[in-house]
C-alpha cells in the first residue's frame, strides 16, 4: 500500500509505484491511500500505474473531478470528515449522486471527525473515527488485494486455548504483541501483553469450569472484525472474577446472552470487547433484588435462542392498552 500526502508530484507517484511494484517482496498489485491533494494525485495517477484500489481522504476537489472519477480504472473509496465542515457534508451528497460505477466504489462521511481526522499527531486526529475509516479502507483493500483470513477459525483456536487447553502461553500466541481485552460490564481484562497475560493466568483460565454450555447464535464477519452472539450457561460454583468480582460462589445457575466483538490485525487477535446483561446475571445469582425493575432473568438469554419465548413481559399493562388498535 502506497501512502501519499500533498508533497508529491504526479511523476513522483508514478515512479514510486513502479519501484514498489519491482521490489522482490511485493506480491500482487498495489493500492494507494491519499490525503487531500495526495488523494487527488493518486486518482490522477491511477491510469498510469498498477493501482488496483485507491482510498482517498478529504479529497481536494478540482473543476475536473467529475470527469476524473468516471475515468479512474480501479475501484476507490472517498472518505470525508464532516464534523464542523458542512461543506464536506454537501460535497459527499453531491459525489454520491455523481458516482454511478458498478465496481464497488463508494463515498463515506464521518460526522464524528473533521478534516484530517485520519492523520496521527495532528490536532485534528480522531482515534475513534480513524478506526472506523480504517475498517472501511480494509473493506476495499482486502476485497481487491487480500490477504484473506478465516476469522472464525482463528478465533476458535484462540478460544480453544482459553477454555480447553487453558494454556496461557498458547492463548497469547494467538494475539498481537500489544493486545487488550475488556469485559465491558465489569471492566475486567487487561491492556498490553503483560497485563493481559497476568489476567489470563490468575483470573481467567483456571476459572473456566468444565460444566459450561455455550451455543453460538450468530456471527458477523467484517474486513477486520468478527462479531459473535452466544448463549452461555454456567454454574457459579467457583470464583469467576470476570463475571462476579468480589462475590463468593453461590451455586446458582446463570444463563446469559453475550456479544463478543473481536478485532484482528493480520491473522492475530488484536482486541476483544465482551458484553452481557450484568443486571440479569446478578439477579440470577441472588445478589440483586430487582423488585419491580424491568430486569430479566434467564428468560432473556432463552429468548435469544427462541424468538417465540414470551415478549413484552415487563410492559404487560402498556401492551394491553394497544390491544385491538389498528396497525
Language model regions located:
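Alpha/beta-hydrolase active-site loop
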Residues: 2-25, 30, 135
